[in-house]
């Protein structure tokens, strides 16, 4: 493969893969949240949707299977079929019923399984010199998929009903399957040619600075995750329709997220991972205060739109830096297991923040809750100096691979 072709083909494939990854995650964390809010389900129950995120934490227990059985491509295809069936089921059963929760959990399991295979494949095919470009494409595509899930599905629902919207959404994984059938590389996981992935992970954990790295993974995006959980319920509480919320997220949100992801990826390339984590993390934290101001002053539509622009752009910045960091510290030979464990730890913080969000926002009110989300970002930022040496050591150890 020529260098020019490699520089556009690998990021393009990453964009397709991570759109497929982001869409079901957006359904679980954005669409269902909005759907139940529109259906007047209690705010605390809406927040509990976040507890389904425990599935992404538990995926570490089946990630070795994906590293050792079959190909990443096969796992991705199987997960896409399961995602389609689960999405259709969400449209058929009543909201917040037992069957609805079962379908939601099935969707999460299929999505988490797909995540493992996609992350491993992306790490395997991405050289260090393309980390910035791939993660720009990844964040932009992933967030765009979440916006389509949270906004596009809502717009469709206002026109044909939520049942029709979920069934229409079920077609998207099948479209992606058809694209990836021709585009995804046909390479095996090659598990028989390397050491036990769990043993390799234990070696990684025992390296100097590993505990600090894990703490940063757990805490770095805690504030942003807590904020996102209560954005759509707040918009609905202010009298916006599902279509209005969808228009904001699909139009303004998509443009700003993609711009933020591209800018974040360029920032990583120019300034390195450590400085990107620190500076873009601060920007991401401060963006939470836009919603705090709007809720505190009960500001009108222009301010609401402005808060959405600031949050989505800055979210793209911070996420690009964070995902580059996760990929950088993984061993490519055990990509599925290592990345699954690290992302599972990240999911612990996300699940905790989101599951409690409805209760905290219900008791404090939206304004105080948004101030709290900004404060939740501080511990992760404060820990960054403790991992600076570890990142430098990782860069040195990976140098021969360039």
Language-model-derived ranges and their functions:
Residues 1-8, 185-215:
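Juxtamembrane intracellular "pre-TM" segments in multi-pass secondary transporters
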Residues 58-71, 259-276, 361-362:
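Helix-to-loop junctions at the C-terminal end of transmembrane segments
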Residues 275-325:
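C-terminal transmembrane helical hairpin of 12-TM major facilitator-type secondary transporters
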Residues 333-362:
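A late C-terminal transmembrane helix in Major Facilitator Superfamily
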